[in-house]
Amino acid sequence: MTIELINEYLKEVSVLFKEINHERNKEVFSPEFELPNIDNKLVKFFSAARAEFCSLGSYKGKNITLLNLMKNEETQTTKTLASLLMVARAINHINKTGESILIFTPSSGNKAIALRDAVNRALEIGLVNYKQLRILTLIPEKSVHKIRTSKLTTNKLLNKLNPICVYKGSESQQVKTIGCDFYANYSKEIFERSNTRVWYSLDINNYKVADALRAYFCYQYFPSNQQEKRQLHAHSVSSAYGLLGYDFGKKKIENETNQLIRSGYLLIQHLDTCDMVLNLLYGSFSRKLMPKYTLDKSTGLFKQLNNHFPLETWDVNESLESTFYTHKPSTSFEMNRLIEANGGSGIVVSMYECIKNIGKIREMLKPAGIQIPIDIRDINEWSLIMAFTGVINSIDRGIINEFDDIVVHGSGFYTKTDYESVNKNILHYVESDEDIISLV
C-alpha cells in the first residue's frame, strides 16, 4: 500500500500545524506553521513524499512490517517528508512578507540531502525563484560521500547561492555548535543587508508534524490491530525525532477516536553514539556504564554478554553509520518516559552483527523491492540494515517478547550506485562560523 503521505493527510497537517504554531521560539526566526494556498504546483511538490507499508512475513512468531519512508529516489531518506513541509512554510512566508529566506542546516548528511532536494524541487516546479529561497548546508567531512549532485551543484549560479560547507574537525557534532554561532553572529547582519531571513532549521518541531503522519498512515493500514495486538515500532535513531513525531500523531488519533493504540518503541543505535540506549537502561549518558568487552584473540572480536549491546564487535567505539552523530540528545528523557509508559526497549548493534545477518535481511526485504547489494561495500547508508539487525537480535535475545507485531521504520538506505556524488571541488572547507559568512 503506497500513498503520497502529505497530500493524503493535508487536512491533518493543517490541524497539527495550528497546534504547534504557538510553540515557535519567537527569539529566533522561523516561518509560521502554515502552508501556501494548495494548488496543482504544490500538490506536485508534495508528491515526492511517498510512503509504503509492506508485509515481510514473520520471524520467530513476530509479524514484521516495513514502513518504507525512503520512496523519494532523489534522497532515499525519510527526511524528505519534513523537508517538503519546511520549504512549503518558507514559500508561504516569502509570499506573505516579500522577505527572502536562507535555510541553514548543519547535518550529518540526510537532513542536508533532503532539504537541498526540496529547495531544488521548489525551484524546478516554479513555486519560488532562486533569489527568494536558498539553502546553506554544513556537514562533517566523514559525510561528504552522502551528498548528491543536482542542479544546485551543476548550475554555477545555483551552486554559488546554495553552498555546501564541510567541517574538517574530528568531532562531527561540532557542526551544530558552529551553526548556532553562525546564526547568533550573522543572521541580523544578513537580514539588514539583503532582506533575507536566516532560518536555523534543527528545531524538532520542524520535523514533528511530518513524522506524526506516520501514525495516521499506520492507523489506516492496521485498523483492526490497534487494540487487539501489541505493536512495536523499531527505528534506528540519533535523537529519535521520528518516534517522537509518531507518538505525537498517535496521541492525536487517540484523542479523536477514543481508542487506545497499544504501541511500544525500540531504539536502535551504534556504539559510537549509543547515548539514548544508555540513558534508557541506566538513567545516564556515561560511557562508564558500557559493558566491559574482552578481546577474543582467536577471532579478533571483542565480546561481552549484555543482550542490549553487541555480543561481538570489531571495535568497542565503532561508528557504523555517520548519520548518527548526536551525543546526549535532549530528546532522550521524553523517549524514556514513552517507553516506560508504552513498553519497548533499546539495543545497540555492531557492523559485525549487521554483516552476520545481512543474508537474512536481504531475503526479508525482497517483498519490498529493496535490494541489498552482494558487495556490501557499496552501501552508503546503513540505517535500514541497523534497524533490521536490531529487531532480529532483540527477538533472538527475548528483549521484546511482549509484542506481536513489529513495524520497522525504514528511514534510510542507499548505495553508491544509486546516485552521483557531488564533485569535491565545489565544497567549502571550514573550521568556524567566520569561514562561512563570506559564502553568503
Identify the role of each PLM range:
Residues 1-440:
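PLP-dependent amino-acid enzyme catalytic core
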